Amino acid sequence: ALARAKALDKGAIKGLLHGLPIGVKDLFDTHDLPTSYGSSIYADNYPSTDAVSVALMRQSGGIILGKTVTTEFASFKSGKTTNPHHSQHTPGGSSSGSAVAVGDFMIPLATGSQTAGSIIRPASFCGVVGYKPSFGKISTAGVKSLAPSLDTLGCFGRTVEDVALGIAAMSGDHELAKVSDLHNKVRIAICKTPEWQYACPETRGALAIARFS
C-alpha cells in the first residue's frame, strides 16, 4: 500500500479515488491479499485476480489498504468486530468490518455486499453512510455469492459525497459521482415488520419525529 501511495504521489491523477485508502470486505477477491470469505477453510486462499469492482477502484487510483471482517460466507458465524461507539453493542453484519473501519476513522471508504440487510444494517449501527444501489448496478464477478438473485454490492463512507465517489468507481459509471441538492422533501416508506415490537423507545420516538418534520 505504501509503495502504491508513493507511486501515485509521483504521477498524474488517475481517477476519482486517487490516493484514497480503501478497505475491501473479505468476500471480494484480491490478487495481492488473502481472501478467506470469513472462513478458516479459506485462510490461505490467494485469488489470481481482483474482483471486477476492486479492479475498477484500483484503476480509479484507490489504494487497497486491507481486507475487512465479514461474517462467514456473509451469513453464518460472525467475525471479531466491535462497534466503534460502544464495545458492548453489535456492529451489525455481514459487512461489519467495513462499517467499523469507516466509523472508527481507519479508512474513508470500504466496500460491502448485501443480500438482505448487510450494508444498511451495519451502516446504521456504526453511524456511517452505507449505500446499496439497485441490483446489478455493480458487477458481482469475483465476489463470493450467497444468493445470486439478491446479492448486491455497495460501499460505506462518512459522507454521501464520499460514498458517491466509491459507487461511481466500483460501477465504472463516473456520472454517479455527481451529488445534487434536494429541492423537495424526501418521502420514505416504513414497513413495520413483526420485529417492530422490539424497537426501543428511542428508535420509535426518532421515527415519529421524522415523520412530521
Locate predicted features.
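Short, well-ordered alpha-helical
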Residues: A1-Y46, A74-S75
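Short glycine/serine-rich loop segments
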Residues: T49-I167
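Short beta-strands and strand-loop turn motifs
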Residues: L33-Y37, G66, A147-P148, I188-T193
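Short catalytic helix/loop segments, enriched in acidic residues and glycine
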Residues: Y46-S53, A206-F212
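Extracellular/periplasmic catalytic domains that process cell-envelope and extracellular macromolecules
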Residues: K14-L17, R58, V102, L182
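Structural signal for hydrophobic packing residues in well-ordered secondary-structure cores
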Residues: A5-A12, R58-G61, K132, S139, ...
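Residue-level signal for inorganic ion chemistry
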Residues: A1, V163, I188
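Gly/Ser-rich, acidic/histidine-flanked active-site/gating loops
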Residues: G172-S213
